[in-house]
Amino acid sequence: SETGNTVTVKGFSPLR
């Protein structure tokens, strides 16, 4: 959740 959006299984937002 670097962008503060929904966290995925990768730990980052879906926009990334």
From Swiss-Prot:
Q: Which UniProt keywords apply?
A: Bradykinin receptor impairing toxin, G-protein coupled receptor impairing toxin, Secreted, Toxin
Leader peptide range in chain numbering: none
According to its UniProt record, in which tissues is this protein expressed? Expressed by the venom gland.
Q: Does the keyword Secreted apply?
A: yes
Q: Which family does it belong to?
A: Belongs to the bradykinin-related peptide family.
Q: Which domain of life is it from?
A: Eukaryota
Q: Which GO terms describe its cellular component?
A: extracellular space
- Taxonomic path: Eukaryota, Metazoa, Ecdysozoa, Arthropoda, Hexapoda
User: What protein name does the entry list?
Assistant: Bradykinin-related peptide Cd-146
Any one GO MF annotation of this record: toxin activity
What functional role does this protein have?
Inhibits angiotensin-converting enzyme (ACE) with a Ki of 61.8 uM, and targets B1 bradykinin receptors (BDKRB1). In vivo, induces hyperalgesic effects in living rats after intraplantar injection.
Principal localization? secreted
Query: According to its UniProt record, where is this protein located?
Result: Secreted
Organism whose genome encodes this protein? Cyphononyx dorsalis (Spider wasp)
